[in-house]
Amino acid sequence: MIKKIGVLTSGGDAPGMNAAIRGVVRAALSKGLDVYGIHDGYLGLYEGRIEQLDRHSVSDVINRGGTFLGSARFPEFRDEKVREKAVENMREFGLDALVVIGGDGSYLGAKRLTEMGFPCIGLPGTIDNDVAGTDYTIGYFTALETVVEAIDRLRDTSSSHQRISIVEVMGRYCGDLTLAAAIAGGCEYIVLPEVEFKREDLVEEIKVGITKGKKHAIVAITEHICDVDELAKFIEQETGRETRSTVLGHIQRGGAPVAYDRILASRMGAYSIELLLQGYGGRCVGIQNEKLVHHDIIDAVENMKRPFKGDWLDTAKMLF
C-alpha cells in the first residue's frame, strides 16, 4: 500500500516541470498521500536531499519556468552501488514510490529503481520532443514559441540587410522543434537530423531562391548536424550573400510555460498518481491523440520509434 511518494526532476530543465511537480503534489495530497521533493534529481536522491512538500510548497509555481526542485545530470546513477545508496535513502524517508520528470535517461533510472522494489512512473519533460510513446513532451510548446519569436526577430534584421541568417535550434537528434518552428516562422530552408544533409545541396537551393528574386532568407537547422559558423562562411563564399549564424542555446529552455504545457504537465502529474495507486511501476506517461496513455519504460526507450513528420516537411517545402 503506497502512503509516501517522492518526486524529482532530472536531466535538462524544461518549462512546465514546475506545473508537473504541482500536479503530482496536489493529486497525491488529495488521495491522502504524503509527498516528498528530491532536490537536483538522482544526485539529490543519492545524497539524501529530500524534504516533505505540502500544498503551499507548490503555490505560485505553475507559471514559473525551470524547476524549483532543481535538476542535475548524474551518469553515476548507472552504477548499482550508487542506486543502492539512493534506495537506502528512500527507505530512510519511508518512500514507497517515485515520480520522475525528465527524458530517456531519466526513464532508465526510474526503471532500475522499479526493479529494485520501488515503483516509479516517468513523465516526459524535455523541450526536444524526442521521447517515444507520446505525441508531445512537457516544455516543447513553450520552447517552440521562444524559437519562433527569435526567428521573427532575425527576419526583421535579415530583410533590412538582405542577409541570409542561419538559426541553430535545440532538439538533440530530433528535428521536431526545428521543423515546427521553421513552418511557423516561415523559414525558407530547413536542415534536420532525419534527412541527409549536404551543404552543397543547401547552397544550390539558396541559389535557386536568389534567381527567383529572394533578397534574404532564414535557414533553420537542428543542433549537432554541423558547425553553423563554418556553414555560414561556406554559404557566403558560394553565394556572395552576407550570411550570419545564430545559436539560440539555452534561452530555449527558459521562460514561463505556455498554457498547453501547463495543462499537459498538470494532467500528466495527476495521472501518475492514479497509476501508482493502481499498482503500476516502471511505466512512462504519454499523450496520444489528446488521450493520456502509459507504456513500459524499456519498451518506450528501446523499441518505440518516434515517427518523423515527413508530411510536415513536404508542406514546408511547398510553402517556401
UniProtKB/Swiss-Prot annotation:
Pfam families: PFK. One of its GO terms (biological process) is fructose 1,6-bisphosphate metabolic process. Pathway: Carbohydrate degradation; glycolysis; D-glyceraldehyde 3-phosphate and glycerone phosphate from D-glucose: step 3/4. Keywords: Allosteric enzyme, ATP-binding, Cytoplasm, Glycolysis, Kinase, Magnesium, Metal-binding, Nucleotide-binding, Transferase. Its main location: cytoplasm. PANTHER family: ATP-DEPENDENT 6-PHOSPHOFRUCTOKINASE, PHOSPHOFRUCTOKINASE. Belongs to the phosphofructokinase type A (PFKA) family. ATP-dependent PFK group I subfamily. Prokaryotic clade 'B1' sub-subfamily. Homotetramer. This is ATP-dependent 6-phosphofructokinase. It comes from Edwardsiella ictaluri (strain 93-146). The lineage of its organism: Bacteria, Pseudomonadati, Pseudomonadota, Gammaproteobacteria, Enterobacterales.
